[in-house]
Amino acid sequence: MCDTCGCGQGDVIPVEIRENLLAENDRAAAHNREHFHRHGVLAVNLMGSPGSGKTALLEATARAGGQRALAAVSGDLATDRDAERLRQAGIRSRSITTGSACHLDARLVHRALHGIELDGVDHFFIENVGNLVCPAIFDLGQTVSVVALAVTEGEDKPLKYPVMFQHVDLVVLTKLDLLPHLPGVSVDAYERSLRQVAPAVPLIGVSAVSGTGMQDWLSWLDARRVDIETAAASADPR
C-alpha cells in the first residue's frame, strides 16, 4: 500500500534502504522541529485509527480552547474533508492528500507548513493518516505524540499495537459519551491494557460531544507548552 515505509511490498525491504529512508525523513523532521521551535509552537503528532475521533477531538479543542490559537494539517489518502471541518471550527488548516501512503512523513509536513502562518499559534496539530502501525515510526518534527483511541475500538488495542502506544506521550480515550451504550466496556479496562505495554504513558478520557475531559486535555497541552518555553529560556545564553 505504501512505497515510503514498504508496508505494501511483498518483498522484504533491505535494511540499508529502510535506514536511508528513515535517515532522510529524520533530516526533514529536524528542520520541522527547528521551525516549530523558532515560532514557539507546541507541535502535536495526533495519531489513531480511522474513526477514532481525531478530527472531532480537534473541533472540540477549538470550542473549549478559549483564546488559544490553533493550527493544523490533516492527512488523508483522499479528500480535504477533515481540513475543511477544522477550518469551519476556526482552526487554521491545510490538507495533505497522501494518495496511497498510509502515514505522513516529515517532508509532506514540511511542504504543508509553507502554507500556514505560525506566528501567534499556540498549538499546532499534525492529524496523521488513520493507522495504528506505520505513523508510529516516522518522526515528523513534533514536540509530543498523542494517540486517540475510541471506547468503541476494543480495550485490547494497546496489546495488539504495542509499538504505537509505547511511542506516544499521551493516550486520549475518546467518545466517553458512548460508554452507557457499551455493556462491559469501561475506562478501567482500557487503562489496564495500556499499563501492560506502556506503564508510564498517561491516559485522559474525553467526549467531544459532552465536553467531558476537555479541560484535562487542554491543561496537558498547556503544560507541554510551558515545558518548551522553559527549555527555550534555559537555552538562551543572555
Where are these regions (language model features)?
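Canonical P-loop GTPase G-domain recognition
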Residues: 179-235
